[in-house]
Swiss-Prot record:
Protein name in the entry: Pancreas/duodenum homeobox protein 1
Gene3D superfamilies according to UniProt: Homeodomain-like
Keyword Nucleus among UniProt keywords: yes
Family note: Belongs to the Antp homeobox family. IPF1/XlHbox-8 subfamily.
Major place of residence: nucleus
Gene: PDX1
Region (Disordered): 34-72, 201-283
GO CC aspect terms: cytosol; nuclear speck; nucleus
Entry's free-text remark on domains: The Antp-type hexapeptide mediates heterodimerization with PBX on a regulatory element of the somatostatin promoter. The homeodomain, which contains the nuclear localization signal, not only mediates DNA-binding, but also acts as a protein-protein interaction domain for TCF3(E47), NEUROD1 and HMG-I(Y).
Amino acid sequence: MNGEEQYYAATQLYKDSCAFQRGPAPEFSAGPPACLYMGRQPPPPPPHPFPGALGALEQGSPPDISPYEVPPLADDPAVAHLHHHLPAQLALPHPPAGPFPEGAEPGVLEEPNRVQLPFPWMKSTKAHAWKGQWAGGAYAAEPEENKRTRTAYTRAQLLELEKEFLFNKYISRPRRVELAVMLNLTERHIKIWFQNRRMKWKKEEDKKRGGGTAVGGGGVAEPEQDCAVTSGEELLALPPPPPPGGAVPPAAPVAAREGRLPPGLSASPQPSSVAPRRPQEPR
């Protein structure tokens, strides 16, 4: 029966082997075993008789094996040696509170689900406000880099900047420093705002000049003539321009005024040396 007792004692020691592990080197004896520290589990109670396990063995044992009582494991010299060292190991102080335990690397104890958050000055901007409500923010590998947020100017700041731009299209550095202090902005913000405002102003000026050139290139539109002036009768009734000599030509005949000219005659005025021929009246 002594062999069976040693068998059950060895089985129990195998189950609780993590609690009885000791470091191989003597310099590690000052700290608790690695399994106790990493597992962070309370130490198991000292071994004692197991009536429950013994009853299970009695139920499952064949009829030819008679039940027996297992003596306390403390009577075994091997188990007594372990009991002698167990209280000393459990009474050891905890490891010193430091950034990392002895022999451990910094990357080993880092939490696996730790997420690298953006910088504090990026959290307060509106561009990153949606990240707090986004469900996939915890799975982001790294924050977005090389992205500047757009500066939101207030109405008071825009009013002062527009007033300054009305007087000076190009701002000097002393005035820029003064505006930066007065409007609670940086010099870079004011410089970039003036650059953008000048570009907008130049585009507006080019558009105005382009509209005026299009009107001037086509020429000034002539006033519309009256429909009566464009008729043939009024054109014939108008007196011809005076010749360069200054002599006044005779008046055009009435028939020419009324447009009743024969086919062979024209309504053009004759020179002053030749007398006009009168048309024959029909009989």
